[in-house]
């Protein structure tokens, strides 16, 4: 089954779409009894990741340079008994995102996905996008600290489903590790590359 561009965009959390830039090395798709590879999604412009589509509607996003793999599972999909090693599962819908990377906000806005963001690493007055600023001023999005000093209590209370960081997070690996210890997947977006 070949997905249309609209279906592909709907199937992925908006955070995964901020990956663009350098060429990604080809990777072998994961195949298990539960995950049956269907096809590699052809990417015309984004080259910093690969997307492998599976028969059950799952998509495996691989970011080779960061050695990161996210398996995006469709809403309502059964829990997998076996997850390939090194793969982080994101169950749709991904909600209560902690968006630290300001450059990614525009993509969320264009995908009409602002409602999936609950937390920001930028204060309201720091936003250059009116929609983000207004969402923070009205309390729809809360400030949860910058990348190097997040408010872990607020992030946990919000039941954060994903932290979208920029590459600065790699300068404070202890923060990334702590978020992951709390069970929060961390995506280091690379749109500035």
Report residues per predicted region.
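Short edge beta-strands and adjacent beta->alpha junctions
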Residues: 28, 46-51
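Charged, glycine-enriched surface loops/patches
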Residues: 172-193
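Sec-dependent N-terminal signal peptides
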Residues: 11-16
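Bacterial Sec signal peptide processing site at the extreme N-terminus
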Residues: 24-34
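A short, structured surface patch at a secondary-structure boundary
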Residues: 57-156, 162-169, 184
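N-terminal export leaders
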Residues: 5-9
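C-terminal motif of bacterial Sec signal peptides marking the signal peptidase cleavage site
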Residues: 20-21
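N-terminal module-boundary/linker segments of secreted carbohydrate-active enzymes
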Residues: 38-45
């Amino acid at each position: 089954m070949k997905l249309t561009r609209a279906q592909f965009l709907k199937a992925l959390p908006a955070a995964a779409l901020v990956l663009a830039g350098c060429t990604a090395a080809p990777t072998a798709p994961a195949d298990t009894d539960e995950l049956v590879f269907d096809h590699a999604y052809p990417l015309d412009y984004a080259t910093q990741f690969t997307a492998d589509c599976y028969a059950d509607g799952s998509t495996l996003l691989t970011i080779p340079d960061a050695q990161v793999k996210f398996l995006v599972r469709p809403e309502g999909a059964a829990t997998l008994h076996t997850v390939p090693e090194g793969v982080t599962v994101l169950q749709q819908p991904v909600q209560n995102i902690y968006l630290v990377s300001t450059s990614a906000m525009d993509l969320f806005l264009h995908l009409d996905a602002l409602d999936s963001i609950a937390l920001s690493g930028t204060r309201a007055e720091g936003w250059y996008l009116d929609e983000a600023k207004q969402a923070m001023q009205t309390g729809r999005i809360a400030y949860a600290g910058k990348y190097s000093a997040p408010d872990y209590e607020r992030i946990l209370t919000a039941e954060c489903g994903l932290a979208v960081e920029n590459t600065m997070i790699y300068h404070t690996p202890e923060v990334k590790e702590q978020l992951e210890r709390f069970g929060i997947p961390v995506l280091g977006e690379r749109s500035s590359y």
